[in-house]
UniProtKB/Swiss-Prot annotation:
SUPFAM superfamilies: Actin-like ATPase domain (SSF53067)
Name the UniProt record assigns to this protein: tRNA N6-adenosine threonylcarbamoyltransferase
Domain of life the protein comes from: Bacteria
Entry's cofactor comment: Binds 1 Fe(2+) ion per subunit.
Cofactor: Fe(2+)
E.C. code: 2.3.1.234
Catalytic activity, as annotated: L-threonylcarbamoyladenylate + adenosine(37) in tRNA = N(6)-L-threonylcarbamoyladenosine(37) in tRNA + AMP + H(+)
Taxonomic source organism: Buchnera aphidicola subsp. Baizongia pistaciae (strain Bp)
Family: Belongs to the KAE1 / TsaD family.
Length: 338
């Protein structure tokens, strides 16, 4: 049995978890800063780092007190080393390294995007390699050829705004506050289909890249030309969401055909979007493919996925060198560069 304590502080959520290779996730706690950023309309990196520093120690104490987990059970401390916000990453790395030192255990550095990609492995029914992965979050939109653990090939990515970023900016223009993506999706449910017709970016391009900046600008112009009527806002939200989802689904099917794969994994914060899941499920059934998602509680940032990947990388990549390491731009396709 291997027991890994995980720490995730790459952006604005402070997360801790413990993963046991025999029993799975035995402790998982997330502190969200979203209410703080509703006032600002988005994340303020310096505030995020300060809040991590304030909250992380409290959450770690909860592992041993509320979770009643003995410190002697911990075999290693895994923390997110990138990609992410510099200040936020440094808090997790510093505290994680100090904790490992105090427990006399090694550290394991985990790539945030690899952790998202592998989160469906926490479920009872797991995907098998190789498969196509769609990673969709506030900062990333990528299509990955997943050949095996640690073996990833980038097939396509956004050339500008990530999906989550585009959602947040359109939501802000609609006056929906932060977090924008979930608020926009709620509003979209009241929208009347077919009222607007927005472009589906790059769907006619043969490559597997995405682009959402043009769509975002197009929608922002539509918002400016219309009044603040609730129904109009809902109609705009619905068509924008459909345009984004269509773009993602079309590229996924194109990539699956290109690779001659039959398995798709969808991970990241945006993967909990019910419209995205509905469209993917429909098209996957049509082609007789298989699709795997993260559990809804593991779609957004969490430390369970960090602890899990830490358990996989433990034997090969654990380090007793307690030098604090982060890489804000750490790519999933170049895991050796940390």
């Amino acid at each position: 049995m291997t027991c890994i304590l995980g720490i995730e502080t790459s952006c604005d959520d402070t997360c801790v978890a413990v993963y046991d290779t025999n029993n799975g996730v035995i402790f998982n706690q997330v502190y969200s800063q979203s209410q703080l950023y509703n006032y600002y309309g988005g994340i303020v990196p310096e505030f995020s780092a300060r809040k991590h520093l304030e909250i992380l120690i409290v959450l770690l104490k909860n592992i041993f007190k509320k979770g009643k987990i003995s410190k002697n059970l911990i075999d290693a401390v895994a923390y997110t080393a990138g990609p992410g916000l510099v200040g936020s990453l440094l808090v997790g790395a510093s505290v994680g390294t100090a904790l490992a030192y105090s427990l006399k255990v090694p550290v394991v550095l985990v790539n945030h995007m690899e952790a998202h990609l592998l989160t469906p492995m926490l479920e009872n029914i797991k995907p098998t390699f190789p498969f196509l992965a769609l990673l969709v979050s506030g900062g990333h939109t990528q299509l990955i050829n997943a050949l095996g653990i640690g073996e990833y090939e980038l097939l396509g990515e956004t050339l500008d705004d990530a999906v989550g970023e585009a959602f947040d900016k359109v939501a802000q223009a609609l006056g929906l506050g932060y977090p924008g993506g979930s608020n926009l999706s709620k509003l979209a449910r009241s929208g009347i289909p077919g009222t607007f017709n927005f472009p589906r970016p790059m769907i006619n391009n043969s490559n597997l890249n995405f682009s959402f900046s043009g769509l975002k600008t197009f929608v922002l112009n539509i918002i400016q030309k219309n009044n603040n009527d609730f129904q109009i806002k809902a109609n705009i939200a619905r068509e924008f969401e459909n345009a984004v989802v269509d773009s993602l689904v079309i590229k996924c099917i194109r990539a699956l055909k290109k690779l001659k794969y039959t398995t798709l994994v969808v991970s990241g914060g945006v993967s909990k979007n019910d419209v995205l899941r509905m469209h993917i499920n429909r098209i996957i059934k049509q082609y007789n493919y298989k699709v795997f998602y993260s559990h809804l509680k593991y779609c957004s940032d969490n430390a369970a996925m960090i602890a899990y990947v830490g358990s996989i990388r433990y034997k090969k990549f654990k380090s007793l060198n307690l030098e604090i390491k982060i890489n804000p731009n750490w790519s999933i396709v170049d895991l050796a560069k940390i």
